[in-house]
Amino acid sequence: MELMVVEADAKLRVARLIDANLDRAREGLRVIEDWCRFGLDRDDLVLPLKDWRQRLGQQHHDRYRRARSTATDVAAGLGHPAQTSRCSAPAIIKANASRVQEALRVLEEFGRNLDPDLASTAAEIRYGLYDLEVRILEACGRQHRQERLEGAKLCLITDPDRDNNLERLLHGVEAALMAGVSLVQYRRKQGNDKQRLLEAQALKTLCSRFEALFIVNDRIDLALLVDADGVHLGQDDLPLSEARQLLGPERLLGRSTHRLEHLLEAQQAGADYLGVGPVFATKTKRDLSPAGLSWVTEASRHAAVPWFAIGGIDIETIPSVRAAGAQRVAVVSAIMSSNDPEEASRTLLQTLA
């Protein structure tokens, strides 16, 4: 008789445990699902989460609910300081994904003998969530990059070909970042790959310190190696569809455009942003004739993604470029050739404000 009481009590405790972890898993899935729905607008991410939540709900039988006893739960209401430090959507997603995965593992272990169907479902969902979590975090990263891109008014393009001194390069870029520049593109046409990698790594670290976007010109392999925020490609570089396959969906992809046909093609192919120019004559694009302010005006009428006027732009010409319709500009010499790159950057930003 005593053995039967002990067995019944053990089953009741396991039922309580299963009830709590079903609640925990479903609640965590709902948190993730709602961010994918309202925060990311991604129905492809919402659908599996909703399906998993419904399947767990169907297996949340009344016998588990009847075993619930919140009043006697010794850990009810127990908190942890880490719970108050989740200040971003990715942090909340990571925490809730871990919560769900842990709950599902508990359901597997304790459900094998009591409820094999539930244990099997929990295992399937747990492995599915491992992969889906990565996709969701990638989508969060892309969204964050997109928001920062839309907020950027001034893009600094480096010019290490003029000066092979890494210390001076970093000094100029850091000065610009201190002034508020939030987008840096690393561009080097000369030199070797070892040199490029060293410079790109140093610039990526510097940009991360200031929470600025870091874009690599031309080189997708280099961008991936240093974990850059994206790549900028010229008209003679890879088609955007092939570039996207290599780069992945979470990073930014830019394209240089010199006429309306280029702009429309780039947008159709999924460019995240555009370079529009060269507006004026520039030493960095000697092979291209200036497109002039008329091209800026035309771009302003057709561009559906963020775009930067580029080419020979400095503090003297910005007013005319803005009057032609540009809200964002990219510069090289106006900052990198200045005796005071921080002040030059600050003045440019004030003019664009």
UniProtKB/Swiss-Prot annotation:
Bilayer-spanning residue ranges: none
Cofactor descriptive note: Binds 1 Mg(2+) ion per subunit.
Residues engaged in binding Mg(2+): 218, 237
EC number: 2.5.1.3
Single GO cellular component term: cytoplasm
Molecular function GO labels: magnesium ion binding; thiamine-phosphate diphosphorylase activity
Class of this enzyme: transferase
Binding site for 4-amino-2-methyl-5-(diphosphooxymethyl)pyrimidine: 185-189, 217, 256, 285
Reactions performed catalytically: 2-[(2R,5Z)-2-carboxy-4-methylthiazol-5(2H)-ylidene]ethyl phosphate + 4-amino-2-methyl-5-(diphosphooxymethyl)pyrimidine + 2 H(+) = thiamine phosphate + CO2 + diphosphate; 2-(2-carboxy-4-methylthiazol-5-yl)ethyl phosphate + 4-amino-2-methyl-5-(diphosphooxymethyl)pyrimidine + 2 H(+) = thiamine phosphate + CO2 + diphosphate; 4-methyl-5-(2-phosphooxyethyl)-thiazole + 4-amino-2-methyl-5-(diphosphooxymethyl)pyrimidine + H(+) = thiamine phosphate + diphosphate
Source species, domain of life: Bacteria
Any one GO BP annotation for this protein: thiamine diphosphate biosynthetic process
Pathway: Cofactor biosynthesis; thiamine diphosphate biosynthesis; thiamine phosphate from 4-amino-2-methyl-5-diphosphomethylpyrimidine and 4-methyl-5-(2-phosphoethyl)-thiazole: step 1/1
UniProt keyword Cell membrane present: no
Keywords: Magnesium, Metal-binding, Thiamine biosynthesis, Transferase
Residues the entry annotates as binding 2-[(2R,5Z)-2-carboxy-4-methylthiazol-5(2H)-ylidene]ethyl phosphate: 282-284, 312
Ranges for region Unknown: 1-128
Cofactor(s) this protein cannot do without: Mg(2+)
Residues covered by region (Thiamine-phosphate synthase): 129-353
Family: Belongs to the thiamine-phosphate synthase family.
Purpose of the protein: Condenses 4-methyl-5-(beta-hydroxyethyl)thiazole monophosphate (THZ-P) and 2-methyl-4-amino-5-hydroxymethyl pyrimidine pyrophosphate (HMP-PP) to form thiamine monophosphate (TMP).
Protein name (Swiss-Prot/TrEMBL): Thiamine-phosphate synthase
